[in-house]
């Protein structure tokens, strides 16, 4: 008897990240080759025609694991019974838009989606937010889903985590598989703090292997933090395939667990650990087991790291205050 299909919702499914994501999901990249997937795809009404074309392509791939596809514009229907919701769709910042305008536009989207998930999602729902500003969008969705445990919401900082590993591998001539215990702290924004001081390369402290504090401060941290802007500058469009890949990485490790002796970066609701204000959705080093995450405890934070973490969490606190003033949480 074949296992019950995992019902996976994807919002913004006709967008660039969605287009890169859906075929990976359907081919088994999330849970392997023995767990069928049922896709529930949400889009705004004007994009449903394009989404129909994407579904035609999914059909034409004849994926062995794809148990079904449903599409629609009503989150209360699309989210019905879903086990995993990947909230990819978000309003991009347009010309003349201030930060408050962006938060307000996305607030309406994630308020509605949070309420719909609260009403109709499966009891074991996990919610991953990729659409930016991801941390605060996740906070809005979480606040509007009071019956879903807060620990079931996470925002994507795995892309930053992966970018940091890639930069460190290039610098040291290492394989990405040699690098463990990378950490992204704070917001998925230019204030994020990629922390090499607890990372390891081949079992050795990464900062010591690099042996170049100036490179860490002046090149590594800004390169990781501003990588998205560099990609837009180079290709004329935002990172889509890498964001989709990181979305799958994050969901897979959340559901299946992190490897022994390693951790990953997830933006999750703070319990006050490491001085991050309680209730903020901030990135931490976490381990995962059976769909539950635990913040890694006991890491030493020096003055340099403390300043970086505090700067990013202050930005998150400002965003929380802004959406509170807008009545979104």
From Swiss-Prot:
The signal sequence is: none
GO molecular function terms attached to this record: L-malate dehydrogenase (NAD+) activity
Keywords from the UniProt entry: NAD, Oxidoreductase, Tricarboxylic acid cycle
- Entries under InterPro entries matching the protein: L-lactate/malate_DH, Lactate/malate_DH_C, Lactate/malate_DH_N, Lactate_DH/Glyco_Ohase_4_C, Malate_DH_AS, Malate_DH_type2, NAD(P)-bd_dom_sf
- Report the active site residues: 188 (proton acceptor)
Binding-site residues, substrate: 93, 99, 132, 163
Question: EC number(s) for this protein?
Answer: 1.1.1.37
Q: Name one Pfam family in it.
A: Ldh_1_N
Which GO BP terms sit in this record? Answer: malate metabolic process; tricarboxylic acid cycle
Binding residues for NAD(+): 12-18, 106, 113, 130-132
As its record notes, the protein acts as a catalyst of: (S)-malate + NAD(+) = oxaloacetate + NADH + H(+)
Reported function: Catalyzes the reversible oxidation of malate to oxaloacetate.
| Protein family according to the UniProt entry | Belongs to the LDH/MDH superfamily. MDH type 2 family.
Q: What's the protein name?
A: Malate dehydrogenase
Taxonomy of origin reads: Bacteria, Bacillati, Actinomycetota, Actinomycetes, Mycobacteriales
Give the gene symbol: mdh
